[in-house]
Amino acid sequence: MASAPNPGPSATTAVLASVAALGIWRLLAVAAPHLAALVLMYESETDFGARLSFVLAWGILNFFWIALLRRPALSGALSLTMVVVLVLLSRLKHDVVQMTANFIDLMMIDRDTVAFLFTIFPNLRWSVIGAGLVTLPLMYALWWLDPFRVRRLPALASMLACLAALVGYSLYHPDEAWRGYYDDGYLSKFFRSGVSAVSDFAQYGFMESAASTNERLNMPLVDACHPAGRRPNIIMVHDESSFDIRAAQGIKVPAGYGSHFKSWDGKERAFLAESNGGPSWFTEYNVLAGLSSRSFGRFAYFVTRIATGRVERGLPLALRRCGYDTMSLYPAYGGFMAARSFQVTTGIERFLDSKDLGAKDVEPDSFFYDKALRLMGERTPNKPLFTFIYLGANHFPWETRFRPDLLPNWRAPGNVPSIDEYLRRQAMSAEQYNAFLAGLKKKFPGEPFLIVRYGDHQPEFAPGILEPGLDEGALGKKLDAYDARLYATYYAIDAVNFEPVKSEAVMDTVDGPYLPLVIQEAAGIPLDPSFAEQKAIMLRCKGIFYGCKDGAEARRLNRLLIDAGMIRGL
């Protein structure tokens, strides 16, 4: 009897044989990045839409590298490396400014930003070099281990399919801006923000402005300003993270707290900032350019960098036309958010950053006040001076005691340690400001000074104590809606040998972009046509700027400034 035919190896046996031939390590090299990404997705993405966006973004990255390299193992490793770096940077950004990274961060990165990071983190350069020395051999090993080769055309088609799906989903279901305050969804929010950013840029560019009109502003003439009476020296003080904490219920404050927020006439006045918790440069744009960062929409985070060389309008320029010299003392490196370039664009003639001033680290307010007194003594005789003093001692974190040697008799009121430290630093600021006023009177007897101080934004913990019953999402929605309670700080006007001019512009509550107007009015400086127009807006809108008529007044003023040549390329 003939033997039965041999059916050959089973399908399972064939697969196992193939695996054995390829080697388990080679297969793991291909699979491991995808498994790691899967774990990361479940850890960082919170809902179906975010996870779908993560998968599509992961597909875009992988198929991009496969189309370029044809090796899926190396492509997966490169994609995973990019995602991990993004997550780390996003978490760092959230720790600093309470917002995660988005696509616009990538759009706006430049040499100044990289130089600033390497300067403030001196070990970062070596960390990058070390990471490169470790990563490059690993990538070469993956190149050698990878057993697969994928054709470029199918990979490119797959990448475009993932991109089309992500764009379609993002347009159909755009990510709400308030979700940026959540410390999650790093990859999905980054890619979806790219769709929104490109859409917004195509619609109105970097900055909103109204359609062209027949209205025109006259360009102000140089030295065409002739104020009545003696022009005071003007000092504007940027009071870092300062607001009246009594706005929150249940906070214990030391005796006498609150006097620092009063003006020369005994009144307390409110300043409505356009940021909360971190980005001081929003307010820097407000008080120097006299315009709204909110006009830049999703691009507002980079407002000073975008405005550099483009927005040639502001308080320093207006004062220079009235014969003032202009000077700025800045507590960080001048490359940070293009601070030096931006301030020069708005009319600052002499910009001194922390390196120029000899600052060793975060310095107390007295350091900058003492430097200002010395520098003001070097000014041109009989010529008024505008000085912008940018303070930083009350910057977060408040978990550590700043300069324990200062204010030795301080007694904590009995709040949580971070709030007590915040109050301690406010007390230091008040004491050192009073010493600065005394220094002005002693060093410049008989000379007139107008001093205007403002809190640039509330501290990062403020929303939680102002609205203790709300979770992170509800607070994010209130912040996104610009609830005034979460943006209110203070502004105060003081004077030495000068009586501030009474003006209807010196209101009890003003939006940040109106502060340059308030300063000029209080100093008795004639307004140029652009500020005269802005004063009319201020009176019509009762101290509200961007929020008036859903931004229509701000867009109209932007258009007038564009047509007058004060704003270019936006």
Region spans (language model):
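Solvent-exposed soluble domains appended to multi-pass membrane proteins
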Residues: 223-226, 236-239, 244-570
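Transmembrane and membrane-interface helices of multi-pass
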Residues: 1-187
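General structural signal for secondary-structure boundaries
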Residues: 97-105, 119-126, 202-215, 280, ...
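A broad, low-specificity signal for short, low-complexity segments enriched in glycine/proline
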Residues: 74-76, 91-96, 196, 287-289, ...
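Generic structural signal of hydrophobic/aromatic residues within well-ordered alpha-helices
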Residues: 36-37, 113, 117, 198, ...
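Membrane-interface segments at or immediately adjacent to transmembrane helices
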Residues: 168-238, 248-249
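Membrane-interface transmembrane-helix boundary segments in multi-pass integral membrane proteins
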Residues: 115-131, 190, 198-202, 419-426
